[in-house]
Design a protein with these regions (language model features):
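Glycine-enriched, solvent-exposed interface loops adjoining structured elements
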Residues: 1-223
Length: 223
């Protein structure tokens, strides 16, 4: 199902098939793109393991902190490959609090290899800092790489779930308080059905708990 199909399905569901429309194609497109991102996070739908720009970070000797790609929100596997090494070494994702309790002096400790990593909202910190240049190797769940713009564009999530994206667009459309189409009952129903299908959005406490589940062999979530 492409963007053109989704907009048409939205208009049928919203009783908005007669010009002049209550909502422009531009607004509906914006809501549908929001829906793809929401679905990806709630359902953990887009697992990335191969794209170098997301899954590989060049690391330098002595430098501990590196930015993550902005679409990556949950890491499922993390390792460090020193240049010239035969195989990468898997890292554990932990919190700074865990390191304070279990590895006193970790901020200044020097070891012969990287052991842990601390993930923040947009970066990864290697502990200790790499003793040699290398590569940070990542796998994890991500947001869509691009938004739909033209009518032929297709959502990145599986085609089986495309029609459910309309539910989020309906929720947004009927939630506009200054619109003649404002309908809180239909908005609530649409949001409830979307949540029933894709799951709830993780709140900040859950994201932190998941990111710092100690130590748990690289499983984290950020937004």
């Amino acid at each position: 199902m492409n963007l053109r199909d989704l907009i048409a399905r939205f208009r049928v569901a919203a009783d908005d098939e007669v010009e002049t429309y209550r909502w422009t194609d531009k607004k509906i497109t914006m809501w549908l793109n929001d829906a793809v991102a929401e679905a990806a996070v709630r359902g953990r739908l887009l697992l990335e393991s191969s794209q170098p720009g997301i899954c590989r970070i060049a690391a330098k000797e002595g430098q501990s902190t590196y930015p993550l790609h902005p679409v990556l929100y949950e890491i499922t596997h993390l390792s460090y490959a020193c240049d010239g090494a035969s195989e990468p070494q898997q890292l554990d994702l932990v919190s700074t609090e865990w390191l304070d309790r279990n590895q006193p002096g970790w901020r200044h400790k020097r070891l012969d290899r990287v052991r842990w990593a601390v993930q923040t909202e947009g970066s990864i910190r290697l502990v200790p800092a790499p003793p040699r240049d290398g590569q940070i190797l990542l796998e994890g769940y991500r947001l869509p790489l691009t938004e739909m713009r033209s009518g032929a564009d297709v959502p990145e999530i599986h085609a089986f779930s495309h029609d459910k994206l309309v539910l989020w667009a309906l929720y947004r459309g009927f939630s506009q308080p200054d619109s003649e189409a404002f309908d809180p009952t239909r908005a609530e129903l649409s949001e409830r059905e979307f949540t029933k299908y894709f799951g709830r959005r993780p709140d900040s406490d859950l994201r932190r708990e998941t990111r710092e589940d100690v130590p748990h062999v690289t499983e984290s979530i950020i937004l």
